[in-house]
Structure formats: C-alpha cells, structure tokens
C-alpha cells in the first residue's frame, strides 16, 4: 500500500523527501497518515475526497477537485436533454426554464472535436478548503428543480464502473443521486467492481 511504500522510501531516503505528490487522495492520505503528517512533509493528492479536504486543516498539503458536482450534473443533463429531444446545451451553456446554467471556460469546457464536456479542476488549499468540506453538495448554479409537468420522469440505467473507488462511491454517485431528483430522472445505478465487465 501507499502507506507502506512511504515507510520504505523514508527508510531509504530519510530527510531527502521534501514533498509527496499522489495520483489520488486515497494514496495521499495513506502516506500522510503513515508518515508525512508526523514528519511535516507536504503531501498532495487528487480527487478532493472529504477526508483529504478535512485533513488540510491538519497539515495535508492540498488536493485537486475534479469538480464532481459539475461532472455529475453534466452526465445526467446530457441524458435528460437527449431523452427530451432538446438542444444538447440546454441547462449547460443555455439556461433551462428553471434557470440552471453553467459558465463555459469557468465551470467546464466543451471540446467540439471530441464532442465532450469536461468539468474544470479546482485547487483545494489551506485558503479555500472549508468551501469543499462536503463534496456532495450540488453546484448552486445548476441545483434548481425542473418542472415535472414540462419534464416528466424518465427512467435511466447508469453503470458506475468501480463502486469501490472512493471518488466514485463517496462523491460522484451521491451527487448523481441528488441531481437525478432535480432533473426528474428515475435512475437505476449498477455498481461495477472495476474488473469484471459482465457485472
């Protein structure tokens, strides 16, 4: 594990380790708790998992928010728009009837060649971490309920590739479950294990 690895590295390199950068907060927190916190070595991760964000107050160096609130919204909004047969940008770059709208270039970018929306990452530091303590709060500018008379309930089947993943299970899916209600979507979530394609 990452916690064991940092112990091995510190035994080999001692005080030559000046900073720890991790590909995700799960590993970052394992290293922080096992070694970095006690040795006051700045440790950084990625995902803005709730435990990592809270640990910034205890010396965790920082993390990167994938803007999961915008990711989850975009996932379900594109589905809602397709099911309703409306312009794909409704509720994204163009306000819907409820007033839901995102700012292109600030909240997300659209890549026309890939026909893809991308939520923009945000740095989470000691200066702003308190704003990110609850990673499952819907993004305010797209948290308005659609009118069920104009946007009747639709059924959706959605696979979560690896439900054991901390980001997907603890942040992304809870956000999807909040947005599905706001967008009048009855979503059946299928939990994958990240390994077996048959499930």
Positions of PLM-derived features:
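Extracytoplasmic "Venus flytrap"
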Residues: 1, 25, 154-182, 188-199
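Short beta-strand elements at the ligand-binding edges of bilobed clamshell
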Residues: 1, 58-69, 189-193
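Loop/turn elements at helix/coil->beta-strand transitions in domains of secreted/extracellular proteins
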Residues: 14-18, 36-42, 58-62, 153-155, ...
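Short, solvent-exposed loop/turn elements at domain surfaces
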Residues: 53, 130-135, 165-170
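Hinge/cleft segment of the Venus flytrap/periplasmic-binding protein
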Residues: 78-154
């Amino acid at each position: 594990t990452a916690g064991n690895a940092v112990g091995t590295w510190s035994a080999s390199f001692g005080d030559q380790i000046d900073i720890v950068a991790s590909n995700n907060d799960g590993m970052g927190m394992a290293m922080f708790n096992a070694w970095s916190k006690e040795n006051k070595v700045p440790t950084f991760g990625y995902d803005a998992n709730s435990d990592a964000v809270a640990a910034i107050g205890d010396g965790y160096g920082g993390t990167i928010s994938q803007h999961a609130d915008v990711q989850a919204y975009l996932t379900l909004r594109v589905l809602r728009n397709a099911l309703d047969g409306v312009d794909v940008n409704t509720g994204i770059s163009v306000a819907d009837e409820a007033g839901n709208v995102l700012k292109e270039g600030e909240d997300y970018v659209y890549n026309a060649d890939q026909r893809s929306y991308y939520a923009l990452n945000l740095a989470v530091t000691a200066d702003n971490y308190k704003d990110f303590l609850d990673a499952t709060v819907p993004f305010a500018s797209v948290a308005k309920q659609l009118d069920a008379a104009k946007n009747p309930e639709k059924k959706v089947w959605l696979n979560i590739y690896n439900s054991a993943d901390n980001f997907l299970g603890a942040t992304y899916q809870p956000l999807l479950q909040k947005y599905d209600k706001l967008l009048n979507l009855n979503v059946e979530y299928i939990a994958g294990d990240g390994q077996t394609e048959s499930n």
